[in-house]
Amino acid sequence: MNFATWAYRHSRSLLSLFAVLAIAGAACSLWLPVALFPQVSFPRVRIDLDAGDRPSERMAIEVTTPVEESLRSIPGVRTLRSITSRGNAEIFINFDWGEDMIAAFLQVESQINKVLPILPAGTTFNVIRMDPTVFPVIAYSITSDRRPLTELRDLAQYTLRPALATVPGVAQVSVQGGQIEEYRVVVDLAKLRSFGMTFDDVANALSASNVLIAVGRIEQYGKLYLMISDTRFQTFEDIGKTILKSGPDGTIMLADVATIEQSDEPQWIRVTADGHDAVLFQVYQQPGGNTVQIAQGIKAKLESLRNQIPEGVHLASWYDQSSLIIASNLSARDAVVIGVGLAGLILLLFLRNWKVTLFAAIAVPSVLCATVLLLYVLKMSFNIMTLGGLAAAVGLIIDDTIVMAEHIIRRVRERKAKATQGVVLEAAAEFTRPLIGSSAATIIIFAPLAFLSGVTGAFFKALSLTMAASLIISFLIAWIALPVIATRLLSAKDAQFDDSGRLTRITHSLYRRFMSRLLRTPILVVFVILPLVLVGFLAFKNVQSGFMPVMDEGGFIIDYRAPPGTSLTETDRLVRQVEAILQTLPEVQTYSRRTGLGLGGDLNEANQGDFFVRLKPGPRRGIEEIMDDLRTQVGWQGSTLQEAWSWISSSLINIAAMPLRP
């Protein structure tokens, strides 16, 4: 008993198995995470260090250097790089690809905790694994013409941030920009010295007077009372009443030697949006989170908080990753629908049999659903690589379906068999070797992409696995399921076929004449192919190359740098000239700008920063044309800024894989 006979005898079981796989895949498509990129763990860790307002020289000696020396002892560290500025430092550690980054992350935290006691008091740190989740999935700006920046920051920090952090899948919500309210103590040095005191005495007195500590407990009448001492300042006047010195000659209070002023904390960054000083908040997702669901949850939560947002405060979304993902999903859906429609049309035109056309309508969705089931088992996600693989595989799936269906129906009509079962199974057996060769050749092309190293391999592994899986499943369905379905659908009536149809006659006639002339003068083939090979080679040598394809993502990023030594105020003045140009472009919907701070939250000098420009949806000029126009207008101004223009997706990868610098 050969395989074809065995398959026919177990046709119900096989069809049930394929149906279960397809239905399970369709169900898994609802649970599969949705993201822009595959979940890639780059062999890179970033450490953010904060030590108050120390000058950069002291920061490098007292904080950065000890931490670096401690981190060098971690096994697997390949390179180590640091950036130090006033009160802050960033350290980037690169490991080898394939390193266990969870273990490396824990080792980094352990080493910093070991060295933390010798660092200046109050030093804090944050260790971040670099992966696609370091880029926000959705971000908003808060601006107002009537509210101060301190109020806007408090709104973001204490109202919006805690509420948005409760949305399922959200890892954290960060706030940038604005002003932080503080009280400034201006000491009269002459008066202070006249009382025989120093600045340290003032600082120590303020620290000791503004505390909340537990002092013990009392058990009484069967109850336990926890005692605390709360001497925190409650009013503006409480600060001035702080006792600096007490003795026989009297008590000296802070108000006797200093003036207390209400002020704002010094800021070393500038953040704007749409031409106004702004506060930005970014939402980051957990690894493996569903980006589309998170974005929908954030929008719903903000809508529910609308009554808590003061009048005159404007919220604008300057980035929404879910919009690009939804567009990718729609493109993949369109590719499937168009592919199935064209395949059905071709089969109907040339074979003129609706039953054979039904094969394509069954095979393509079944293969894609079964592939989605495999993606779910492998804990992958819907992203531009897997969706691209599914869309690219549609044509190959249809090819397997068409050639098998055409071969079966041709054999049935040639034999003019009254009982088609034996003919169908025989035709399927005849076509097994060509089908195996065709599928294997294509799989061999894409399978090696899964073994590439570095960033390329990390991304193309998802594409390779998706295409290889879909082609293997397509082969199995074309080899097993289609013949079984054909034995049940095709009848003796389908063996009757009149090949005198007009389209068939025209096609056969043109093909015979063309091939007859070509075979009489085979040298023509050489003369036609050689120029094509030459043109292809020249195109290959001159075509531009890049990691990510150029696509309209609805926005772009401008990194800029002023001449070295430029102050924050001067850089801000230069950048506002670019903002003025941005506001004149009709295609710009909104934008955000950072100076002294990076898009990924990394440190920048006072003369560096970036723009994130979001364009309006709908009909408009191409994104490259808009960028060229803006670049030209900025150049006409004679600006001293150096700019680097980039796509959103490439910037995301650069932030995670290496710091992007203009």
Regions found by a protein language model. Give the residues of each.
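Short helix-loop junctions at transmembrane helix boundaries
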Residues: 35-38, 321, 372-389, 450-467, ...
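Signature of alpha-helical transmembrane segments and their immediate interfacial
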Residues: 1-34, 429-431, 498-548, 628, ...
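Transmembrane alpha-helices and their membrane-interface boundaries in multi-pass membrane transporters
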Residues: 123, 394-408, 432-451, 458-498, ...
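Hydrophobic transmembrane alpha-helices and their membrane-interface caps
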Residues: 25-31, 36, 314, 341-410, ...
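Juxtamembrane segments of multi-pass membrane proteins
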Residues: 524, 529-633, 648
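Helix-loop junctions and hydrophobic alpha-helical segments within the transmembrane domains
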Residues: 318, 325, 329, 405, ...
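Interfacial helix-loop-helix hairpins and adjacent transmembrane helices
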Residues: 1-15, 415-426, 455-461, 480-530, ...
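Membrane-proximal extracytoplasmic
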Residues: 1-341, 349-350, 355-357, 382, ...
